[in-house]
A protein has these predicted regions:
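Long, charge-dense
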Residues: 32-81
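A C-terminal functional module that forms or caps the active site or interfaces directly
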Residues: 108-114, 131-139
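C-terminal functional extensions of proteins
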Residues: 129, 133-135, 149-170
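Short, acidic/small-residue loops that bind anionic groups at enzyme active sites
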Residues: 20-44, 141-159
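Active-site rim beta-loop-alpha module in soluble metabolic enzymes
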Residues: 60-61, 65-120
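Gly/Ser/Thr-rich loops at beta-strand to alpha-helix junctions
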Residues: 5-18, 30-36, 55-59, 129-135, ...
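Metallocofactor- and cofactor-centric catalytic cores in central/energy metabolism, strongly enriched
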Residues: 1-8, 20-22, 114-116, 122, ...
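Interfaces and regulatory segments of ATP-dependent nucleotide/adenylate/phosphodiester-chemistry enzymes
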Residues: 126
């Protein structure tokens, strides 16, 4: 397509298609916010971790080592904490393709993230793998003081790299 600079996905599970899609095009391909993890990892001390929030941790965990390998982070599972939202009240609407009650879900996400930080004080960065979680990113940043990255952050990162810098000559 004319004017397309890259191909993006918005769900961590799209990482399963990263290599296939990359081979089909000459465009940059970034199918998941999980692809930001190699960039985020060097900001942390070796003892610190990245938490990946996902719609369903039971489904994501078995495939995460392969996804991390695709990102160049093979053998790095110990640097990640995976937390699922499958038990957050109201979040089941996502899996059921129903309307989500954001107020109900926000309360559950807050509790989940605060518990995560209490259980894992070594978590210093949050990556929202699920597209639906982006709506809660600002609140999570506010209550944790931690950086939060999601599908929008992933796309913005690439887009900013393609944008002209108005302060520099062409």
């Amino acid at each position: 397509a004319q004017g397309v600079a890259g191909i993006s996905g918005d769900c961590g599970f799209m990482m399963n298609y990263q290599e296939f899609i990359r081979k089909q095009t000459k465009l940059p391909v970034f199918m998941s916010s999980i692809m930001l993890t190699p960039t985020l990892m060097p900001m942390l001390n070796p003892s610190e971790k990245i938490a990946i929030l996902t719609a369903n941790s039971v489904n994501l965990k078995p495939g995460l080592p392969k996804m991390l390998k695709t990102c160049g982070l093979e053998g790095q599972m110990d640097r990640f904490v995976v937390v699922g939202c499958q038990d957050v009240p109201g979040f089941e609407a996502v899996a059921n393709a129903e309307k989500v009650d954001p107020t109900k879900v926000m309360s559950g996400i807050e509790k989940l993230v605060l518990q995560l930080i209490e259980d894992h004080p070594d978590v210093k960065v949050l990556v929202f793998e699920c597209t639906e979680l982006g709506a809660y990113a600002n609140r999570v940043r506010a209550i944790t003081g931690l950086p939060v990255f999601d599908a929008i952050s992933n796309m913005n990162f690439f887009q900013r790299g393609m944008a002209e810098n108005a302060n520099l000559p062409k």
